[in-house]
Amino acid sequence: MKKNITVLMTVASILIVLGATLFLITACSASSDSSGLFGSKGVETAIDVTDDFNKINIVTDTADIRFVQTNDGGCKVVANDKKNIKYSVTVEDGILKINSADELRWYERIFNFTKASLTVYLPESEYDSLTIDEHTGNISVPSYFKFATTDIKLSTGDVNYYAKTLESLTVKASTGNVTIEGESSGTVNAETSTGDIILNGAVCEGDINANVSTGDVIIANSTCKNLNSHGDTGDIKLENVTVAENVQIERSTGKTELINASCANFDTDADTGSLYMTNVIASGSFTIKRSTGDVRFDGCDARDIYVTTDTGSVKGTLLTEKLFNPRSDTGEIDTPKPSGTGACDITTDTGDIIISIKQQ
């Protein structure tokens, strides 16, 4: 019996190998060459653009996209992709439109290992708008370009955006990291489902919104009107940030850290995660809520301070006297005597409350 099973398994293995071999021979014949089948090399397509335009619209499936400034005043689009991925480049109503069409056969999709790329050579440094709708691929926009508005949507891939944006900048990625560096005068909206957001050097008259489902957020050396960040899982860090009005941070799970920040009001709410604040000043109030997590102040202050935690200690130093009102069901309490005019209500179910006034 065992011998029969062994024979059957051997025959089955031989048939599988023969079937795979016949498939490859047939597919290669239909594809005309094995390099087209396995995607070992791409086909380069270069298209010159002679009409004037001030807006750019790109819709592609799978390609890394980058932009290069030309020195000769010419414009061209260079695509390197599978030969059955066709690119069209047109100018309509002042809009440079770049689109890809997928004409791959089914077996070419299985063995498609080509690393596709799309390079856009631009003669000018400033344009009215940049719009990109990409499925899979990395996107890079260098610093010597300037756009009035930018809107980037990406399913899978990283975005590195270093250009200046005059009005609004929106970057949304399902899976991938988003890095934004450079001056953005209007509003910045960055969003990822799975991935990190890094924002550095933004100078905004409008708001900064940085939202993630799973991922970390770092915002540094930036100014804006309001700053908002919502996320399920991940840490957030603000450093050297000036906000004219309100900072609002919500997290389900993750550490929150603020260093050298100023605002009118700071509001944060998290289920699980500690809060660390160093040299954070609010002209209005701190409103802090934690289910599980510690709160630490180092040389911070606000007119009014409200802290509520279920499990976690509240410790640190403030800059001015307050009307301290600490309450803890289980934990040590050590705060200065009530003084001044600003409120400082701190409530914990389980945790210590130890606050002092920092000597200046």
What do these predicted ranges mean?
Residues 260, 274-282, 294-299:
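C-terminal amphipathic alpha-helical segment
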Residues 2-60, 64-154, 160-173, 177-192, ...:
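Acidic (Asp/Glu) and glycine-rich low-complexity loops/linkers
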